[in-house]
Amino acid sequence: MQANGGTEMIKAVIFDMDGTLVDTERLGIKAWKAGAAELGLAIDDALIHQFIGRTLVDVMGILEERYGSHEIAEAIYVRHKEIRDEMVKTELELKAGAAECLDELLAAGYHVGLATSSRHVTAERNLKAFGLFDKFETVTCGEDVVHGKPDPEMYLLACKRAGFAPEECAVVEDSRNGCVSGITAGCHVFAVPDIVPLPQDVVDGCDAVLDTLFELTAAVKDVR
């Protein structure tokens, strides 16, 4: 674990979902590639990595720019979603320490919130599969904001819904886009990198970079 420390007492912990709590990013990569291939198109890892932490509107914009057609972008997205939804039914797994750290934080009296670029129906489905959705006291999803991550709007709204100032809130993220959103919002940011390593400038802006969520509660409590 790398830690930079902090100055304000944390009262709320707000989690990203995809790649942070549930291992959806790997399934998503497989689904994007399979969906594109069925349409006779290629899609590379570098493009898919741009989707991580983004809202559907942003993802569609990236696809349209790459393929030059709204119809092609929509076809790839629709087929990818069909494939991914089937995979989620049998292959979705929790990230290590997800359930344990939620229980620890709630027991310690922290407000626990969710801030995900996924739509509400997707977040509810994926987290209810593991009995976690009802643990979140506030939920902010992709359809709740105009500007998705890395814009700070989602975390500013999540802090407002939690009832705390950004400097009283910790953000838990796996991706560059998510971390930048939390940092720009003025929150404490704890990163647990998933598929794509974080660039050094993002690492420098985080309070801590953790190996797993098992380390999170102690790291949050260490901020004074």
Model-derived features: positions:
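Helix-loop "lid/cap" segments that line or gate small-molecule binding pockets
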Residues: 35-36, 55-69, 126, 158-159
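Asp-based, Mg2+/Mn2+-dependent phosphohydrolase catalytic module
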Residues: 2-11, 103-106, 119-224
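Conserved SAM-binding loop
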Residues: 21, 94, 112, 147, ...
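Active-site neighborhood of HAD-like aspartate-dependent phosphohydrolases
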Residues: 5-49
